[in-house]
């Protein structure tokens, strides 16, 4: 099959490739309530909206005017109108792709999948708390 054909694109598009993604995940994912955000360090992408989370990673959406150049090594999770803040989680980007581009191409909405590194006991406790109180249920 030619690589440019429609069925090949659907099958190999990261958005549609759920089977491989599910096989790589070790922990159950949970949908996150509105108002939870992620900030990377170092970052050239600003703040992103948290979509789902597990004990070993998360997915977020963010808006950018360019392809990310800096690979973050840590992230913070915070919730608006809440004192909750989980800081300094070690991380690495698993995937990052465009989900929408403006007509003029100046901005794009991107989705990034992140895997956590080794967490401290305190970070694990706070992450468990976040999943318990700031998610709406399993994906």
Positions of predicted regions on the chain:
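Short, solvent-exposed secondary-structure boundary/capping segments
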Residues: 58-62, 97-115
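Short beta-strand-centered aromatic/proline hotspots
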Residues: 47-50, 88-96
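A generic structural motif
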Residues: 54, 93-97, 118-120
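Short, conserved charged micro-motifs
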Residues: 67-71, 122-125
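Short conserved beta-strand and strand-loop elements enriched in small hydrophobics
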Residues: 35-40, 71-87
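Short, charged, solvent-exposed linker or helix-capping segments at domain edges/interfaces
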Residues: 102-103, 123-129
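A generic structural micro-feature
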Residues: 28, 67-69, 83-85, 105-109
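N-terminal helix initiation/capping motif
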Residues: 1-66, 128-139
